[in-house]
Amino acid sequence: MSLTVKSLTSEWWPALEGLFGRAGASNGCWCMYWRIGPRYRDRPRADNRDDLRQLAASDQPPGLLAFDGDLAVGWCELAPRADLAWLGHSRFLGPVDDLPVWSLPCFYVRRTYRGRGVTDALIEAAVPAAAAGGAPALEAYPVDTAVPGHTTNLFPGVAAVFARHGFGVVARRKPDRPVMRLSPLARWRRPGLRQPSVLSGRRGPGRSRSGRRRRSRLPPPRRARAR
């Protein structure tokens, strides 16, 4: 499987709609939860959809889409933490310090593609994308599935996946919900790159050309072109 990752702009909005379906990924959320909190449940689903569509048309795309050919197979929200107001309301995921980090709070992968490296590809693309936006660090708020009784809501991703991409725990206010961070991001920054980089040829987590398992690590800076 060869994946490409693109920033969500108006050009790719129909692909996102196809991925999210009528449910808007989950319960009509349309990835609005970390922006407006539980209020997303009380609004018409179309309002949540339209808000995300407006963000896709803005100068700051709200996230990344992973494609297998022309089919959108995965999504992650990627934004400056300051744009995700509801993170500040969480007792467990509130700011660790005053650093103007970017955040990777939520993922959605097409059911038939789960466990096939889509999340890995999205994380790999998010790192240079955040760096291009000027982020000093990138944060995530995954579930630590090694903790007994952990939440079964895995939309934030899994801690072990972030760990193999170089993220480290910077706070743990709830056993199964660490705050993880990758920093500094300066070595991934590319002058003039405004949009997330495009990754291609992704074969799934930790696989070489021969298909053998290899040790997964955060890739070095690579040449990327804006989309």
Residue ranges of model-derived segments:
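Active-site rim helix/loop that mediates acceptor-substrate recognition in acyltransferases
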Residues: 30-63
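C-terminal "cap" of GNAT-fold acetyltransferases
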Residues: 153-160, 165, 170-227
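Conserved acyl-donor/pantetheine-binding loop and adjacent beta-alpha core of acyl/acetyltransferases
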Residues: 58, 67, 71-110, 114, ...
